[in-house]
Amino acid sequence: MPKRTDIRKIMVIGSGPIVIGQAAEFDYSGTQACLSLKEEGYQVVLVNSNPATIMTDKDIADKVYIEPITLEFVTRILRKERPDALLPTLGGQTGLNMAMALSKNGILEELNVELLGTKLSAIDKAEDRDLFKQLMEELNQPIPESEIVNSVEEAIQFAEQIGYPLIVRPAFTLGGTGGGMCDNQEQLVDITTKGLKLSPVTQCLIERSIAGFKEIEYEVMRDAADNALVVCNMENFDPVGIHTGDSIVFAPAQTLSDVENQLLRDASLDIIRALKIEGGCNVQLALDPNSFKYYVIEVNPRVSRSSALASKATGYPIAKLAAKIAVGLTLDEVINPITKTTYAMFEPALDYVVAKMPRFPFDKFESGDRKLGTQMKATGEVMAIGRNIEESLLKACRSLEIGVDHIKIADLDNVSDDVLLEKIRKAEDDRLFYLAEALRRHYSIEKLASLTSIDSFFLDKLRVIVELEDLLSKNRLDINILKKVKNKGFSDKAIASLWQINEDQVRNMRKEAGILPVYKMVDTCASEFDSATPYFYSTYAVENESLISDKASILVLGSGPIRIGQGVEFDYATVHSVKAIRESGFEAIIMNSNPETVSTDFSISDKLYFEPLTFEDVMNVIDLEKPEGVILQFGGQTAINLAKDLNKAGVKILGTQLEDLDRAENRKQFEATLQALNIPQPPGFTATTEEEAVNAAQKIGYPVLVRPSYVLGGRAMKIVENEEDLRHYMTTAVKASPDHPVLIDAYLIGKECEVDAISDGQNILIPGIMEHIERSGVHSGDSMAVYPPQTLSETIIETIVDYTKRLAIGLNCIGMMNIQFVIKDQKVYVIEVNPRASRTLPFLSKVTHIPMAQVATKVILGDKLCNFTYGYDLYPASDMVHIKAPVFSFTKLAKVDSLLGPEMKSTGEVMGSDINLQKALYKAFEAAYLHMPDYGNIVFTVDDTDKEEALELAKVYQSIGYRIYATQGTAIYFDANGLETVLVGKLGENDRNHIPDLIKNGKIQAVINTVGQNNIDNHDALIIRRSAIEQGVPLFTSLDTAHAMFKVLESRAFTLKVLD
């Protein structure tokens, strides 16, 4: 079937900000789809609120709107653009839910907009739990015994009929949001209440738990001619009961018999055909390990996290082909872009094993509930490719960047057997390491299988690794054993640890013995056809398939898995850097380990190495490719952390040199640099012991800001107000030592702003200055940033530009740099300098129209700023106002406190742009799903130090129609100062009128809660904040943010004035 000619303009809805359950995979799929549609000659209009994505670059679609993905704004854009069709299946759950809302509100019908890819009826049947149940019954596909409920009472009734355990699955939600497993009525009531609240259609499916079955996924494609194929099947290491996004996953499935595979494959193809999906679809199934009995768990009628994984695992570009199918092309007439000789109708074949491992945020959220269940908690993932399970698993392990290079974590030797077995039974994020430890202690596979329901096949593979550890320990420096363990994916570092020598010695010994990796191609066809894909993975085999060209090459290191503090912004910078390298006439090579991102799309670079970002793996690629140099600036802390070892190994690092990186990161050197340049900074000291820290704080005076050196995202950063808290921090939060000093700084309360700049060693370009709405004390990644600055005087701006120039030249920066300033009493202080790309780079690139990563890359390669058209120093400011606002995933992370502070907690960002600050703020809040009505009730429960400022804020909220509720201390202060309030209780104050109840009953429209440093662990305040998050009520833990929201509400209100 030829492509359709009756449609000309297509609108694509993106997935919005990155949250747990919906990460960079939609940037990858959305980018692919937009380019694929443009390739076919269609005009593409894109709507997405996330500025950190490649997808929202001007050249990806014909028209790009970075606007809130809400009914109000998408409808406005539809009315303005009048597209012929809408493609919602590439924007994750956000895109699907928006399509449903547009349809239900009659917008699509009114504007005569056709839905492409997956029809509304199919979305409804897959997402509406009742319709899905009916369809499965019609197809004779087994599903667990279940009931659709719209109230808690109905859920209890069903539970009384069939008993526990049960699983709650809310309709139309993402990543298992609001769902969970229940073993009793109390848990059922709690989870169903949250689930109904979070489901846009107030509906939950309550089903009999089949936890313990094998979880298998099939990624399937279908076109309008009813051609259908399986792209890839995948098997979860963890059984049903743990969200697939939180599970280790292998592709292809490892333990299925031919009969089982055929059974599940037929079911998946029957389902996609019955739903008449045109494009990609993910089917999740549960298989009884002891019979051929299976159940259909869920169907995602769209491109998903699993399809991004399947695309990267096979090389088959699902999103690109889904877009072509959506406009009428069929699988048997589209050429497979990898082989360039076969058609897309050929099912991919794999001659390797892929392992995906989730990356959890618990290194930042130590108080978080680590127990895994049906609600997703991972922020990102890594993928590794090997010739056997052991190899791919160990490569994935060391890709995670959690301080491990093997399936062993520190201090497990000291864990008692009781604790060990409890950790294995409980299924937390680190269970894999405890399983390996149990095998080291000779627990039987049968025992571990019965505790976990993990297939014995996988446990046996772990036992192979453990037995090889033992073999290594008993045969020190044995070359044959070395060869054997390298084949199974052991790292040089792990071997060195077992042999009690250093990593360099293992590396040299291995190289002398000729034990070197070769690189194999990912070609979709297990080498059956010729393929020209420049997509490689390492293994210890015979033939090397990565041929080195004569062209000079540059290696760019990516940023690894998405985690809090290092998100998709760094992938954005990596992709742009590669573009500039290619434009400069070099061969661009990317090395990265993240399957979700655009940078690991093989069409982006001249060569892609899908490998862990460790010294060993990077050096192996460098030894083979012999690049002109390596660019580290765009890979976040991941790449920067490799600088020292690469430099020592003689690798040419391009851009700012190691000694200058050190001068910015090393406290003493940095202080000396600032003093030499005559630039003020808050007084501070470095401490390597508890006593040193206490002495430093006494000299500076409390409060002080404490943090470890060399971290990203403010990890373990804290504001400390007294000696007791400081001693507690030094003994629990960090392990200070001469190698790992702790920085102690005076905490200045003032206005914070930051600058991204490009330096060529002689001149600098500052695309823009960003002013933070929240004052210092809230991490810059969690602050709302405004460009251009709205309240900075010309003198302050000139000072910032002057200090930036001095620092760029004084630190010999070549390429990108980010500087953070605090302004107190009209004096500018430098807080920190990062001589690399920062997370604000995509936002600033979008709003200034300067492709910063590209300019910086060309400068790194030797170009000068005078050869560009952007001039020097501060670039002229935009006449629009642009706001970058953080987005959080607290609903997914029970027990994580939503109070903002110096440690970063946001997972993503949105952007709001308009002609003035109030309108831009309105858009930013709407895009971040922080919506407040024009009137209602607002609760104030604030710290004593904030009461005076909070009073003024409460007065202005009252002036626009809000009723002020306050807890006792706040209410007494407000009443004494002439502001009438409604007194509310916190908790346990023998009063029905307490805040969590009021929030639950819909009586409260917003909560303003601030806490002094000495009361951070206040239990009542924690529960109030948690209640607001769970019920979706706007929560402000900074008065500055609450004031920004007031500006929005005020701008929407009319002035009501008594006649004089």
UniProtKB/Swiss-Prot annotation:
Q: Which residues bind Mn(2+) 4?
A: E832, N834
Where does the record place the region Carbamoyl phosphate synthetic domain?
Answer: 547-929
Q: What is any one of the record's Gene Ontology cellular component terms?
A: cytoplasm
* Residues annotated to bind ATP 2: R707, A746, L748, E752, G777, V778, H779, S780, Q820, E832
Q: Where is this region: Oligomerization domain?
A: 402-546
Q: Where is the ATP-grasp domain?
A: 133-327, 671-861
One Gene Ontology BP term is: glutamine metabolic process
Instruction: List the InterPro entries hit by this protein, alphabetically.
Output: ATP-grasp, ATP_grasp_subdomain_1, CarbamoylP_synth_lsu, CarbamoylP_synth_lsu_oligo, CarbamoylP_synth_lsu_oligo_sf, CbamoylP_synth_lsu-like_ATP-bd, CbamoylP_synth_lsu_CPSase_dom, MGS-like_dom
Disulfide-bonded cysteines: none
The similarity annotation says: Belongs to the CarB family.
Could you identify this protein by its name? Carbamoyl phosphate synthase large chain
Q: Which gene encodes it?
A: carB
